[in-house]
């Protein structure tokens, strides 16, 4: 699946997107964040406060417990503000 990173998540990881193949046990957005954070220091820094990270699966905003099975694209970004 393609994973995209936006704003400071992208800045901390150092790339805008990548293709990943998480292990079979990674079934939710929350589990994907945990798996990504374990991939190295830059990922750990980007996901150090996972409760503030927002996610979208195939362009639809989702909660951390959303299933990732069948997802083509998952995006991670910080909270947005309006104005």
Where are these regions (language model features)?
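Ubiquitin-like/PB1-type beta-grasp interaction modules and other compact soluble beta-rich domains
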Residues: 1-82
């Amino acid at each position: 699946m393609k994973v995209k990173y936006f704003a400071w998540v992208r800045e901390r990881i150092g790339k805008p997107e990548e293709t990943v193949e998480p292990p079979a046990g990674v079934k939710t957005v929350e589990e994907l964040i945990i798996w990504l954070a374990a991939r190295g220091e830059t990922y750990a820094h980007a996901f150090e406060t996972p409760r503030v990270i927002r996610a979208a699966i195939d362009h639809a905003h989702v909660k951390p417990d959303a299933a990732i099975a069948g997802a083509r694209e998952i995006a991670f970004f910080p909270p947005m503000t309006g104005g």
